[in-house]
């Protein structure tokens, strides 16, 4: 059987497609992004703004007589892979990557109104052991757990990451409200990195002003455990239910605490304010130009130099 895989988003490696590829190749099928004369087509999109494009592709391949499967969070939050595909070693050669990706847990203990996880995955639970998706010779792992520190096996999994000296990126973010002396001590021994495996990085979020005190306590606890503030990055949701003033307050507080902020506009919002704010923060322009000066347009030469770099 010839199996064509289509990643509509093409923003980052699609884990579901890698598992589908592995399953079909195990059966002896030809599977990939450039398969001619397909008998079956899998189309996946994570983002809702690509839904129309994905549905258009599905209709096209159906008109050619192909069997078509379409899925992903952008299409159907409840659709999941069959267990025999979900729990297979992903085909990392599909994207030519040399790091592993996976979930040790699914779901979350929170119920944030902007997040699809509660609707998609429900309450937190164990999902898979690290060895199910980890390739030891690479020693690099990106964990997609939505709330790793709340998972039933967080302690065992941290101990395993430490013992095996795995370079890991918690790029979905850890919950700063759950930081305590015990997990901070273990995290200090983990080989944690950003998702490029270049800089030492632990990711958190500061989406709610109400968690300010817990956040400050968490930062202090991590620092006391030996984790430098420069290793901490906080995602900051903007454009959901906050004012401009509240957004700036949270960002300025993070800068004052000497940790790294990273702006995340809600649902990819493109109001003129949000792209400017994201550029000012995410490209570290704030280290050179105050916000008031930046938004007034009086720092365009500096901005152009940064964009060239």
Tell me the role of every PLM-derived stretch.
Residues 5-9, 42-46, 116-218, 229-240, ...:
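Core AdoMet radical
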Residues 20, 53-61, 157-158, 183-187, ...:
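A general structural detector for well-ordered alpha-helical segments in enzyme core domains, enriched
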């Amino acid at each position: 059987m010839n199996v064509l895989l289509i990643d509509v988003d093409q923003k980052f490696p699609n884990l579901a497609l890698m598992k589908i590829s592995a399953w079909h190749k195990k059966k002896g099928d030809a599977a990939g992004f450039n398969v001619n004369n397909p008998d079956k087509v899998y189309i996946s999109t994570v983002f809702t703004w690509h839904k129309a494009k994905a549905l258009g592709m599905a209709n096209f391949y159906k008109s050619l007589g192909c069997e078509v499967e379409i899925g992903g969070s952008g299409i159907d939050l409840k659709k999941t892979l069959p267990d025999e595909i979900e729990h297979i070693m992903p085909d990392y050669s599909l994207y030519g990557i040399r790091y592993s990706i996976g979930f040790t847990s699914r779901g979350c203990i929170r119920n944030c109104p902007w997040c699809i996880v509660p609707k998609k995955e429900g309450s937190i639970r164990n999902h898979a052991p690290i060895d199910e998706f980890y390739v030891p010779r690479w020693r690099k792992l990106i964990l997609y757990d939505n709330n790793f520190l709340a998972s039933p096996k967080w302690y065992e999994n941290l101990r395993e990451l430490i013992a095996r000296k795995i370079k890991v990126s918690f790029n979905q973010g850890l919950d700063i409200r759950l930081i305590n002396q015990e997990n901070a001590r273990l995290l200090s021994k983990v080989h944690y990195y950003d998702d490029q495996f270049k800089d030492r990085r632990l990711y958190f979020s500061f989406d709610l002003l109400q968690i300010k005190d817990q956040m400050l306590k968490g930062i202090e606890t991590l620092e006391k455990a030996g984790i430098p503030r420069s290793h901490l990055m906080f995602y900051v949701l903007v454009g959901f239910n906050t004012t401009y003033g509240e957004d700036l307050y949270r960002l300025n507080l993070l800068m004052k605490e000497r940790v790294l902020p990273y702006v995340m506009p809600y649902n990819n919002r493109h109001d003129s304010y949000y792209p400017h704010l994201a550029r000012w923060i995410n490209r570290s322009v704030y280290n050179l130009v105050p916000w008031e000066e930046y938004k007034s347009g009086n720092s365009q030469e500096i901005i152009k130099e940064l964009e060239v770099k």
